[in-house]
Amino acid sequence: MKILWAALVLTLLAGCRADVEPEVEVRETAVWQSGQPWELALSRFWDYLRWVQTLSDQVQEELLSSQVTQELTLLMEDTMKELKAYKSELEKEVGPMAEDTKARLSKELQGAQARLAGDMEEVRNRLSQYRSEVQAMLGQSSEELRARLASHLRKLRKRLQRDAEELQKRLAVYKAGAQEGAERGVSAIRERLGSLMEQGRLQALTSHPLRERAQAWGEQVRGRLEKVGSQARDRLEEVREQMEEVRVKVEEQTEAFQARLKSWFEPMVEDLRRQWAELIEKVQVAVGASTSPPSQKS
């Protein structure tokens, strides 16, 4: 009878486990159904970790060659990069949010992000430790190491899932706060614009006489400017004519002065030229007389 009861209990427990475990898998998969790039990157890390947890022969081989830790490192970096980019996009939208609320939400978000990064780092470190432990066994049985690793990985996956869900919630709150602040900002701007438009309408009604006076004054100023411009053009033309008359007079006086100088100096030049010619002639006569040979006596 006890054997039958024991068999019945084991059957019930096995059935409960068979019913519960698929729900856990479905829940784990459903967590990452959002379309944000950082969540898709984390989903790839999650799926790869689930494959590592099988500890199959291929996993064992790649663990010993450090290929698994290298792949996890790349997936971690990709997740953190996408998460940082998404957070930056949200920070651009939180302008209208109150500063104290913004600081509180940002601090909570940073804490959740740090916990997720720490979980991923611990997974990688634990796998590196396992590789070192297996290599130190020098060919001995490593079943106990694999069992401890499998248990540790299950705990790490649960913690990773919990912290990832917490980060999702913090990001959702942060985004909701940003949207609420933006809506308040838009509402305030809309009210301000409405007030300004009403003020502008009232000012337009009251400023109509002022506009007419301003237009009349503008026409008057424009007429005066045109008159001044016309007078300036006339004056400029008059000055140009006077300058032309002065130029003609200067040229006439210059020509007269040149003619007078010519009348003064030409007689003197002619007289000097004549005297010079006479002097040359006398010198030549004198030189010729002094060089002629004396006459011979018979």
Curated annotation (Swiss-Prot):
Magnesium found in the keyword field: no
Subcellular location: Secreted; Secreted, Extracellular space; Secreted, Extracellular space, Extracellular matrix; Extracellular vesicle
Span list, region Lipid-binding and lipoprotein association: 204-272
Modified residues (Methionine sulfoxide): 137
Chain positions with Phosphoserine modification: 141
Binding site for heparin: 156-159, 218-225
PTM (free text): APOE exists as multiple glycosylated and sialylated glycoforms within cells and in plasma. The extent of glycosylation and sialylation are tissue and context specific. Glycated in plasma VLDL.
Alphabetized Gene3D superfamilies for the sequence: Apolipoprotein
UniProt entry keywords in alphabetical sequence: Chylomicron, Endosome, Extracellular matrix, Glycoprotein, HDL, Heparin-binding, Lipid transport, Lipid-binding, Oxidation, Phosphoprotein, Repeat, Secreted, Signal, Transport, VLDL
Protein name: Apolipoprotein E
Species assigned in the record: Hydrochoerus hydrochaeris (Capybara)
